[in-house]
């Protein structure tokens, strides 16, 4: 789960990470009061969406007067913004962050993530802040520093000092780097964070470090023990279908193809999509109904798939271990009848009660294509999708 910048900075403040003075508004009527709370020679008006690269897309505006601030806020609030990180989709701007301006001397990059290779929390630091870190890593890998935190002892003071020395920090900023890194690490542990990022972390003319931007991603699997963070969720920034799927305990990710997929198990779902691609097709989604699939959840899964007008055929691939194939068949029949399905459905069932499941499908009177194996199912669903295109 992603947080907005203003939410992330609120967490930063709780952990002693310095941020600019700022006020979030979601109504233009609150703008004057917000400006009055920020003693600054100018302001920054920042669109709040779940994406980076907002500045390049016109979502961050530097203003010097209240009139300019009002114009910028009027243009942004209530509109939508697409960046290079939104895959062509414009996200709604329902809130703005109004911040003070700073005299910036130098910009750094700082992030903390879970490294699956070393199985540690890992800091990534660079003196080349304010840029896409991927581009820096590609063009100048020597500018990227990393620090792996041993989970048995935690972040050590000497590791913070090494980074401060490497960045050439002195005085107040040198000491601040240690507190920022310690705050980062504790925040990640306390809040089940999968990614923390400041880009840029700026060194001001007063030799102080300030988090000019903030990005926080929370491990969605841990939200059950983070009720305070759940309240920060902004569904308007999410794909409507993915949000609805989560409400029904379905794992759904929208893709760009025309072949809908319904599978139980993430690994089997990925293998199914691979075979569709191998046969020349394009999956329209990833959808894992899970091991405890019920007829009701299967029906909801069908509705999710069909919510995309691009879908021209559907492949249902179920291996009945925990879930019984006859129950899946009931769900398929129920869903087809409920939604009045008009596109081809290819079904591959294997496992517990598979014979009974196939009998139910055969006796349903519905136009459902059965397959004898996964390879056969992939071939058939791609073929019927191609026919629908002609």
UniProtKB/Swiss-Prot annotation:
Keywords: ATP-binding, Ligase, Magnesium, Metal-binding, Nucleotide-binding, Tricarboxylic acid cycle. SUPFAM superfamilies: Glutathione synthetase ATP-binding domain-like, Succinyl-CoA synthetase domains. GO terms for biological process: succinyl-CoA metabolic process; tricarboxylic acid cycle. Its cofactor is Mg(2+). GO terms for cellular component: cytosol; succinate-CoA ligase complex. InterPro entries: ATP-grasp, ATP-grasp_succ-CoA_synth-type, ATP_grasp_subdomain_1, Succ-CoA_synthase_bsu_CS, SUCC_ACL_C, Succ_CoA_ligase-like_bsu, Succinyl-CoA_synth-like. Substrate binds at residues 264, 321-323. Residues 9-244 form the ATP-grasp domain. It catalyses: succinate + ATP + CoA = succinyl-CoA + ADP + phosphate; GTP + succinate + CoA = succinyl-CoA + GDP + phosphate. Its EC number is 6.2.1.5. One of its GO terms (molecular function) is ATP binding. Pfam families: ATP-grasp_2, Ligase_CoA. The keyword Magnesium applies. Binds 1 Mg(2+) ion per subunit. PANTHER family: SUCCINATE--COA LIGASE [GDP-FORMING] SUBUNIT BETA, MITOCHONDRIAL, SUCCINYL-COA SYNTHETASE BETA CHAIN. Heterotetramer of two alpha and two beta subunits. Succinyl-CoA synthetase functions in the citric acid cycle (TCA), coupling the hydrolysis of succinyl-CoA to the synthesis of either ATP or GTP and thus represents the only step of substrate-level phosphorylation in the TCA. The beta subunit provides nucleotide specificity of the enzyme and binds the substrate succinate, while the binding sites for coenzyme A and phosphate are found in the alpha subunit. This is Succinate--CoA ligase [ADP-forming] subunit beta.
């Amino acid at each position: 789960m992603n947080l907005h910048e203003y939410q992330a900075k609120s967490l930063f403040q709780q952990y002693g990470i310095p941020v600019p003075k700022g006020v979030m508004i979601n109504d233009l009527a609150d703008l004057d009061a917000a400006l009055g709370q920020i003693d600054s020679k100018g302001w920054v008006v920042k669109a709040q969406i779940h994406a980076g690269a907002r500045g390049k897309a016109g979502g961050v505006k530097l203003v010097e007067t209240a009139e300019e601030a009002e114009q910028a806020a009027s243009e942004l609030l209530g509109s939508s913004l697409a960046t290079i990180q939104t895959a062509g989709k414009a996200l709604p701007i329902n809130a703005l962050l109004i911040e003070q301006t700073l005299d910036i001397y130098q910009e750094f990059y700082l992030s903390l993530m879970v490294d699956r290779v070393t199985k540690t929390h890992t800091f990534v630091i660079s003196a080349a802040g304010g840029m896409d870190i991927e581009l820096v890593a590609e063009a100048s890998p020597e500018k990227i520093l990393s620090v792996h935190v041993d989970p048995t002892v935690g972040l050590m003071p000497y590791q913070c000092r090494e980074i401060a020395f490497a960045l050439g920090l002195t005085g107040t900023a040198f000491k601040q780097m240690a507190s920022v890194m310690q705050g980062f690490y504790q925040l990640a542990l306390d809040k089940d964070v999968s990614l923390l990022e400041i880009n840029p972390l700026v060194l001001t003319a007063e030799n102080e470090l300030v988090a000019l931007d903030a990005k926080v991603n929370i491990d969605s699997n841990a939200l059950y023990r983070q009720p305070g963070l759940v309240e920060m969720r902004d569904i308007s920034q999410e794909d409507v279908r993915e949000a609805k799927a989560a409400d029904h305990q379905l794992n759904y990710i929208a893709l760009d193809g025309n072949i809908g997929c319904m599978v139980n198990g993430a690994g089997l779902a990925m293998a199914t999509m691979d075979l569709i691609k191998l046969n020349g097709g394009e999956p329209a989604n990833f959808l894992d109904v899970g091991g405890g699939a019920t007829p009701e959840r299967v029906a909801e899964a069908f509705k999710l798939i069909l919510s995309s007008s691009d879908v021209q055929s559907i492949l249902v691939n179920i291996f009945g271990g925990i879930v019984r194939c006859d129950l899946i068949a009931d769900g398929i029949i129920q869903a087809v009848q409920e939604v009045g399905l008009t596109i081809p459905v290819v079904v591959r069932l294997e496992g517990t009660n598979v014979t009974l499941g196939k009998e139910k499908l055969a006796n349903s009177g519905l136009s459902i294509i059965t397959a004898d194996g996964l390879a056969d199912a992939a071939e058939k669903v791609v073929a019927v999708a191609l026919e629908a295109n002609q």
